[in-house]
Design a protein with these regions (language model features):
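Loop/turn elements at helix/coil->beta-strand transitions in domains of secreted/extracellular proteins
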Residues: 21-24, 53-54, 121-125, 161-162
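Short, solvent-exposed positions on alpha-helices
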Residues: 36, 40, 119-127, 164
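Non-catalytic carbohydrate-binding regions of carbohydrate-active enzymes
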Residues: 76-149, 155, 171
Length: 236
Protein backbone atom coordinates (compact mmCIF):
# COMPACT_ATOMS: atom_id res chain seq x y z
CA UNK A 1 0.00 0.00 0.00
CA UNK A 2 2.98 2.33 0.42
CA UNK A 3 3.22 3.11 -3.29
CA UNK A 4 -0.47 4.09 -3.26
CA UNK A 5 -0.31 6.42 -0.25
CA UNK A 6 3.00 8.17 -0.95
CA UNK A 7 2.81 10.74 -3.80
CA UNK A 8 6.52 10.27 -4.47
CA UNK A 9 5.95 6.57 -5.08
CA UNK A 10 2.67 6.76 -6.96
CA UNK A 11 4.11 7.40 -10.42
CA UNK A 12 6.26 4.30 -10.18
CA UNK A 13 4.04 1.71 -8.58
CA UNK A 14 0.60 3.03 -7.77
CA UNK A 15 -0.77 4.47 -10.99
CA UNK A 16 -2.36 1.29 -12.26
CA UNK A 17 -4.06 0.33 -9.01
CA UNK A 18 -5.50 3.79 -8.37
CA UNK A 19 -6.89 4.13 -11.91
CA UNK A 20 -8.12 0.53 -11.75
CA UNK A 21 -10.30 1.23 -8.72
CA UNK A 22 -11.51 4.59 -10.02
CA UNK A 23 -12.21 2.80 -13.28
CA UNK A 24 -14.64 0.56 -11.45
CA UNK A 25 -16.48 3.70 -10.32
CA UNK A 26 -16.72 4.79 -13.96
CA UNK A 27 -17.99 1.44 -15.23
CA UNK A 28 -21.47 2.54 -16.17
CA UNK A 29 -23.86 -0.32 -15.51
CA UNK A 30 -24.89 -2.11 -17.60
CA UNK A 31 -23.62 -0.50 -20.80
CA UNK A 32 -19.91 -0.49 -19.95
CA UNK A 33 -19.97 -3.52 -17.69
CA UNK A 34 -21.58 -6.45 -19.42
CA UNK A 35 -20.58 -10.02 -18.60
CA UNK A 36 -16.87 -10.74 -19.21
CA UNK A 37 -15.82 -7.08 -18.78
CA UNK A 38 -15.90 -6.61 -14.99
CA UNK A 39 -12.09 -6.44 -14.84
CA UNK A 40 -11.56 -5.11 -18.37
CA UNK A 41 -13.37 -1.84 -19.11
CA UNK A 42 -12.18 -0.37 -15.81
CA UNK A 43 -8.58 -0.97 -16.89
CA UNK A 44 -9.00 1.30 -19.92
CA UNK A 45 -8.29 4.12 -17.47
CA UNK A 46 -5.29 2.31 -15.99
CA UNK A 47 -3.63 1.61 -19.33
CA UNK A 48 -4.07 5.22 -20.49
CA UNK A 49 -2.67 6.67 -17.27
CA UNK A 50 0.25 4.25 -17.22
CA UNK A 51 1.09 5.15 -20.84
CA UNK A 52 0.88 8.89 -20.11
CA UNK A 53 3.55 8.70 -17.41
CA UNK A 54 5.58 5.79 -18.79
CA UNK A 55 5.26 5.92 -22.60
CA UNK A 56 8.53 4.03 -23.03
CA UNK A 57 7.25 1.13 -20.93
CA UNK A 58 3.72 0.34 -22.19
CA UNK A 59 2.48 -2.39 -19.89
CA UNK A 60 0.81 -4.79 -22.32
CA UNK A 61 3.76 -4.58 -24.71
CA UNK A 62 6.56 -4.97 -22.16
CA UNK A 63 5.37 -6.84 -19.06
CA UNK A 64 6.49 -10.41 -18.53
CA UNK A 65 3.38 -12.50 -19.09
CA UNK A 66 2.03 -15.74 -20.51
CA UNK A 67 2.14 -15.82 -24.30
CA UNK A 68 -0.69 -18.36 -24.51
CA UNK A 69 1.69 -21.24 -25.11
CA UNK A 70 2.85 -21.63 -21.55
CA UNK A 71 5.87 -19.37 -21.96
CA UNK A 72 6.38 -16.18 -19.95
CA UNK A 73 7.84 -13.52 -22.24
CA UNK A 74 7.92 -9.70 -22.46
CA UNK A 75 4.72 -8.62 -24.16
CA UNK A 76 3.17 -12.04 -23.69
CA UNK A 77 -0.34 -10.57 -23.39
CA UNK A 78 -0.21 -9.16 -26.90
CA UNK A 79 1.33 -12.33 -28.29
CA UNK A 80 -1.47 -14.30 -26.63
CA UNK A 81 -4.13 -11.95 -28.02
CA UNK A 82 -2.73 -11.93 -31.57
CA UNK A 83 -2.33 -15.69 -31.68
CA UNK A 84 -5.51 -16.88 -30.00
CA UNK A 85 -7.78 -13.99 -30.94
CA UNK A 86 -6.73 -12.60 -34.31
CA UNK A 87 -5.11 -15.67 -35.88
CA UNK A 88 -7.01 -18.57 -34.30
CA UNK A 89 -10.31 -16.71 -33.95
CA UNK A 90 -11.05 -17.28 -30.27
CA UNK A 91 -14.12 -15.41 -29.09
CA UNK A 92 -13.19 -12.29 -27.14
CA UNK A 93 -15.53 -12.87 -24.16
CA UNK A 94 -13.97 -16.32 -23.68
CA UNK A 95 -10.43 -15.05 -23.24
CA UNK A 96 -9.58 -16.04 -19.66
CA UNK A 97 -6.98 -13.31 -19.04
CA UNK A 98 -8.41 -9.82 -18.45
CA UNK A 99 -5.20 -8.26 -19.78
CA UNK A 100 -5.45 -10.24 -23.02
CA UNK A 101 -9.04 -9.05 -23.28
CA UNK A 102 -7.88 -5.46 -22.77
CA UNK A 103 -5.63 -5.57 -25.85
CA UNK A 104 -8.21 -4.63 -28.54
CA UNK A 105 -9.59 -1.79 -26.40
CA UNK A 106 -6.04 -0.53 -25.99
CA UNK A 107 -5.56 -0.76 -29.76
CA UNK A 108 -8.56 1.52 -30.26
CA UNK A 109 -7.15 3.89 -27.65
CA UNK A 110 -3.81 3.97 -29.44
CA UNK A 111 -5.33 4.48 -32.87
CA UNK A 112 -7.82 7.21 -32.04
CA UNK A 113 -6.43 8.85 -28.89
CA UNK A 114 -2.64 8.52 -29.03
CA UNK A 115 -2.01 9.58 -32.65
CA UNK A 116 -2.51 13.38 -32.56
CA UNK A 117 -1.20 14.09 -36.07
CA UNK A 118 -3.48 11.55 -37.75
CA UNK A 119 -6.53 12.66 -39.70
CA UNK A 120 -8.65 10.18 -37.72
CA UNK A 121 -7.59 11.58 -34.31
CA UNK A 122 -10.53 11.49 -31.88
CA UNK A 123 -9.03 11.64 -28.38
CA UNK A 124 -12.36 11.72 -26.54
CA UNK A 125 -13.98 8.76 -28.27
CA UNK A 126 -14.22 6.59 -25.15
CA UNK A 127 -15.68 9.42 -23.11
CA UNK A 128 -18.21 10.05 -25.88
CA UNK A 129 -19.20 6.39 -25.83
CA UNK A 130 -19.58 6.59 -22.05
CA UNK A 131 -21.80 9.65 -22.43
CA UNK A 132 -24.05 7.81 -24.88
CA UNK A 133 -24.31 4.90 -22.46
CA UNK A 134 -24.98 7.25 -19.56
CA UNK A 135 -27.94 8.76 -21.39
CA UNK A 136 -29.37 5.53 -22.77
CA UNK A 137 -31.73 3.27 -20.87
CA UNK A 138 -30.27 -0.19 -21.42
CA UNK A 139 -32.14 -1.77 -18.54
CA UNK A 140 -33.35 -5.23 -19.43
CA UNK A 141 -31.05 -5.67 -22.41
CA UNK A 142 -29.22 -8.95 -22.74
CA UNK A 143 -25.45 -9.03 -22.34
CA UNK A 144 -25.15 -9.81 -26.03
CA UNK A 145 -27.15 -6.70 -26.89
CA UNK A 146 -24.92 -4.64 -24.60
CA UNK A 147 -21.79 -5.85 -26.39
CA UNK A 148 -23.40 -5.09 -29.75
CA UNK A 149 -24.41 -1.63 -28.52
CA UNK A 150 -20.86 -0.91 -27.43
CA UNK A 151 -19.54 -1.70 -30.91
CA UNK A 152 -22.30 0.32 -32.55
CA UNK A 153 -21.57 3.29 -30.29
CA UNK A 154 -17.86 3.17 -31.09
CA UNK A 155 -18.61 3.20 -34.82
CA UNK A 156 -20.98 6.15 -34.37
CA UNK A 157 -18.51 8.15 -32.29
CA UNK A 158 -15.45 7.69 -34.52
CA UNK A 159 -17.53 7.81 -37.70
CA UNK A 160 -15.90 4.71 -39.16
CA UNK A 161 -16.96 1.16 -39.92
CA UNK A 162 -14.99 -0.91 -37.44
CA UNK A 163 -16.89 -4.14 -37.95
CA UNK A 164 -13.91 -5.88 -39.58
CA UNK A 165 -11.79 -4.95 -36.57
CA UNK A 166 -14.41 -6.17 -34.11
CA UNK A 167 -14.80 -9.40 -36.08
CA UNK A 168 -11.06 -10.09 -36.15
CA UNK A 169 -10.64 -9.56 -32.41
CA UNK A 170 -13.54 -11.89 -31.64
CA UNK A 171 -16.18 -9.43 -30.48
CA UNK A 172 -18.48 -9.41 -33.50
CA UNK A 173 -19.07 -13.13 -33.84
CA UNK A 174 -21.95 -15.41 -32.92
CA UNK A 175 -21.75 -16.69 -29.37
CA UNK A 176 -23.99 -18.54 -26.95
CA UNK A 177 -21.96 -19.20 -23.82
CA UNK A 178 -22.48 -19.21 -20.07
CA UNK A 179 -19.64 -17.07 -18.74
CA UNK A 180 -18.27 -16.83 -15.22
CA UNK A 181 -17.65 -13.18 -14.36
CA UNK A 182 -18.30 -12.88 -10.62
CA UNK A 183 -21.19 -15.23 -11.24
CA UNK A 184 -22.44 -17.13 -14.28
CA UNK A 185 -24.40 -15.28 -16.96
CA UNK A 186 -25.30 -16.10 -20.54
CA UNK A 187 -23.93 -14.05 -23.42
CA UNK A 188 -25.71 -14.62 -26.71
CA UNK A 189 -25.15 -12.95 -30.07
CA UNK A 190 -26.64 -14.42 -33.24
CA UNK A 191 -25.31 -14.33 -36.78
CA UNK A 192 -28.30 -12.21 -37.79
CA UNK A 193 -27.38 -9.64 -35.13
CA UNK A 194 -23.80 -9.57 -36.41
CA UNK A 195 -25.03 -9.06 -39.96
CA UNK A 196 -27.40 -6.30 -38.82
CA UNK A 197 -24.56 -4.39 -37.15
CA UNK A 198 -22.35 -4.80 -40.20
CA UNK A 199 -25.12 -3.39 -42.38
CA UNK A 200 -25.64 -0.47 -39.99
CA UNK A 201 -21.93 0.38 -39.81
CA UNK A 202 -21.55 0.26 -43.59
CA UNK A 203 -22.88 3.83 -43.70
CA UNK A 204 -19.42 4.87 -42.50
CA UNK A 205 -16.09 4.63 -44.32
CA UNK A 206 -13.58 1.97 -43.34
CA UNK A 207 -10.61 3.14 -41.24
CA UNK A 208 -7.57 4.19 -43.26
CA UNK A 209 -5.62 1.31 -41.78
CA UNK A 210 -7.22 -2.07 -42.53
CA UNK A 211 -5.14 -3.79 -39.84
CA UNK A 212 -5.76 -1.86 -36.62
CA UNK A 213 -5.92 -5.26 -34.92
CA UNK A 214 -2.12 -5.53 -35.33
CA UNK A 215 -1.41 -2.17 -33.69
CA UNK A 216 0.66 -1.90 -30.50
CA UNK A 217 2.35 1.03 -28.81
CA UNK A 218 5.57 -0.16 -30.46
CA UNK A 219 4.13 0.38 -33.94
CA UNK A 220 2.06 3.49 -33.21
CA UNK A 221 4.35 5.84 -35.15
CA UNK A 222 4.17 3.62 -38.23
CA UNK A 223 0.37 3.62 -38.11
CA UNK A 224 0.07 7.33 -37.32
CA UNK A 225 2.42 8.41 -40.12
CA UNK A 226 1.39 5.59 -42.47
CA UNK A 227 5.02 4.59 -42.92
CA UNK A 228 5.95 1.95 -45.49
CA UNK A 229 6.63 -1.54 -44.23
CA UNK A 230 10.34 -2.32 -43.91
CA UNK A 231 12.16 -5.64 -43.85
CA UNK A 232 12.35 -8.83 -45.85
CA UNK A 233 9.46 -11.22 -46.31
CA UNK A 234 9.92 -14.24 -44.10
CA UNK A 235 12.95 -12.73 -42.38
CA UNK A 236 11.65 -9.68 -40.51
Amino acid sequence: MWDLADPDQTHDGGLWAIAHELGHVNQIVPGLKWVSTAEVTNNVYSICLQYKYHPDEPLLETSQSDDGNGESIPGGCFNHFLTSGVVEGKLWPLQEDAFVKLCPLWQLMLYYRMAPTASWYKPDWYGDVAEIVRNTDETGMSHGQLQLNFMRNVCDVVGEDLTEFFSKVGMLKPINERIDDYGYTWLTITQDECDELKKYASQYPKPISPVVYYLTANSLEAFEKQLPVKGMYGAG
